[in-house]
Amino acid sequence: LLGGAELNVAIGVQRLGHTTEYVSRLGADPLGGYAKKQILEHGVGTTFVTEDADNWTGFQLKQMVTTGDPQTFNYRTGSAAAHLSADVLDDVKLDDVKIAHMSGIFPALSETSNQAFRHLMDRLVAADKLITFDPNLRPALWNDDERMIREINEFAKSADIILPGMNEGKILMGSEDPKDIADFYLNQSDRTKVVIVKVGPAGAYVQTRDAEGFMVPGFKVNNVVDTVGAGDGFALGVITALLEDKSLRSAAMRGNAVGALQVQTPGDNDGYPTPAKLKAFYEAEGVSED
């Protein structure tokens, strides 16, 4: 199955009718060839997916479950993506970028990928591109919790919109309270204008720099099959709504909706909707975007 946080978002954004480009590096091996073919079949651009003849394609093993959270095992250390260097990212064209979605997973892969991530962040900031950032904490990849916390919070300073989870907030700044989490990130950087905190089935808390925060309730799911991909679904819901000039309330509601649809399927991104499926879901729930 094709997956991975950033790619999940790209697939879901594409499925909702928007153009996406994925930035990564694959090995010159059968797994890399299969992955690139699948990425293209999902309609995601691969202009900036490069091939590495010397290193292998990273992968993940995921336990198949009938409900809840599966165990996952990452095999990415030493992979082609872990060798993606900053100079390669100079070839990434930013002119047509409307929103750049960044995740805290890639900089955890290696020192090389960490520097590449910083370089791309700096380029995006210099080009004044809107950056969404999902901390996507993976302690097993960092192997150093203090460094993970320090660097994820530093990366967040470059983001316009930050999408942490409530549990991530507890690790990153010591509180599970959505308002405390939002205040922390709004106060640490003038660039950050919006923080949307994922609070699980309860929904999401939205806070801007110049207005009172508010909750956007989640949708009830009677049968949770697999939770992997729900957070990425939330991110792509927010991103696509903003691309369509929807309000922040609608963006959070769409994020909640996509997350709810995703947890009802076994794959990492199988539940991400088309526009028609999203419309049908809203109609069944008796809600609409503004």
Where are each of the predicted segments found?
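Conserved N-terminal subdomain of the carbohydrate kinase-like
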Residues: T19-G104, K279-D290
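Alpha-helix C-terminal capping segments
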Residues: L1, N8-T19, M64, T240-E244
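A short, N-terminal amphipathic alpha-helix
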Residues: L7-E21, E41, F184-Q188
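Conserved beta-alpha-beta core of the PfkB/ribokinase-like small-molecule kinase fold
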Residues: I99, I105-F184, A202-G203
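Structural alpha-helical scaffold elements that stabilize or flank donor/cofactor-binding regions
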Residues: V92-K93, E154-F155, Q188
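Conserved phosphate-binding/catalytic region of the ribokinase-like
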Residues: D122-R123, G174, P178-D290
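Short, conserved phosphate/pyrophosphate- and ester-handling motifs at nucleotide-, phospho-/glycolipid
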Residues: V13, G165, G231
